[in-house]
């Protein structure tokens, strides 16, 4: 497990830029132009076994004890080189040692260099046996990477592993720029551990010291090390001033932790954010525990609750053991339904509506797999809203392909549904689904014929409260058996032609597709809907055999789905254009018997569902993607979206977007506790744009703006300005995003955030602008259209 830490400890600045190629690679190359490189042949082996070569204008000595060299003195051994106006060589036989101790004193214009460092000063000393070197009142420059400084005394120790400075300074800025530096009474640079340790450290911006610490660490590479990371600060309207001081703990090669005290002025306390990562034989995972001991804002809004401990726990795990066992955890739980409205977290959002807690253990061998899982939901919309959990659920699959010309599969499921409310129906559901398929295909087409039997048994309990409610149209039954056969034939052809007349080298395909699906009607009004919802119907979704997800609602079908796709490929076999259009024609009404489903009372047949998708790569820099779905059962366009993008490179792009979802579609597809929320009563109708652009040398700007035409209000706004150099990077950003809905005042709640971040450069291999990461972090994230 590898974690890169391009950070400076406790310098009261923050990092928000991440690595990219393109412009980042160009900047890295430019920065290295100001860094010296080792240009002599690299010598390997034991340096003490290598000869010492001395060149000078004049030499005199008392052999074998000492010698004096003057005038352009140049001493070389292995990769080390010492130059000076005068060098005094001393050789002394130590008692009990086979080799004499050889030292040199250098005076005047002393210059020492090897493949790691360059030292310069008026006076120097070196031990030719141990390669220990001292240079007084000089400066140093790291070789092959950024890093330089000055010191009263500079020492090389441990076969050049350590550079030790007394009253020294360090900066990664290139020569000629001292924008920032760290000065200490002692500085030890450990090349093996890739760290610089500094005692009595003063962090300076230009000549002005702004921070003091008795001890600091500077990482000078990408190696994982325990220590404080770069702090971060920002201002938001919901928390006012916020300050982060993360500490990274490198526990072991296979596990680490990041502990972050997060001060929030408006909350009047510190939230402790604790992230733990691990890698074991059973898999890899991440745990997060965030804890706020008290929250004065929440306590003022909820005085009856008293002191409120607010927290988040997140656990993600995925792993395989002994090649057959599979373990997965996806668990998120928070202290209260307002948590994600009040606090930003990468583990959840105020727009999610719920948090999932799922555990699963699976076993898989050839032709067989089984999974036992539990799944619960924490709903944020309303504390009185009910939700179902699967406690537990067993899924089993058995495959036997190439059984003659047939492929076969048997799927089974057993699940027990429990509701968060005591008066809601609960059930045990057992489902068995054998399938036989006859696949036929060649290079120009395919025909798949499939038959299956879906047998489901329900044992429902706690029905009295539901059945006695006059508002419920359906009456539930204690025991229900439902058996439904299904037959499907799906055929596809691929025609191809050369477009030599219109576009030489280009190829066009025409791909018609026809599917017939038959499922007989079964009245399911006696079954409560525990886990079914309407599935989205894009072009590919037209050819699904299910209208609803889950098993509680399986709609009857006597329908033909037709569609056609055409694609255009260039002479390099790159897809430049495609468009797909399809429809579902119902010979008989699609029904489940559930009177709560509005359109089942309309008795509609014919062409009810249409869908189309298109993609056009106009050029290497321009791309268009669009889709629309029309459902006559909803009497409206269900969803549509379009995206036009111009991309010059990784960090220079402009994208225009349109998103639409009808209120009828939202009510049909989302759970009632979410779809009936005030902010969705008119559906979603948004236009917006995202952009990232290099506006000048090393300056870039990023922005995003989405406007909801239904409410005539912005949905999301973000603007960021970045400067990137070899020495440091700066980002100033503003964001205004939707953060919930005030039911009492009937208006949206927005959060405004202003951030100012700085990163010291040259301490690692990171030179990226990070513009796409900024765009993807939005509440409406950027997705490429290319």
UniProtKB/Swiss-Prot annotation:
Keyword Nuclease: no
Keyword tRNA-binding: no
Alphabetical list of Gene3D superfamilies matching this protein: Lipopolysaccharide (LPS) transport protein A like domain (2.60.450.10)
Disulfide bonds: 31-726, 173-727
GO biological process terms on file: Gram-negative-bacterium-type cell outer membrane assembly; lipopolysaccharide transport
Leader sequence segment: 1-24
GO terms under cellular component: cell outer membrane; transporter complex
Domain of life: Bacteria
Compartments reported by the entry: Cell outer membrane
PTM entry text: Contains two intramolecular disulfide bonds.
Family: Belongs to the LptD family.
Matching PANTHER family: LPS-ASSEMBLY PROTEIN, LPS-ASSEMBLY PROTEIN LPTD
UniProt subunit comment: Component of the lipopolysaccharide transport and assembly complex. Interacts with LptE and LptA.
Protein name: LPS-assembly protein LptD
Species this chain originates from: Salmonella choleraesuis (strain SC-B67)
Gene symbol of the encoding locus: lptD
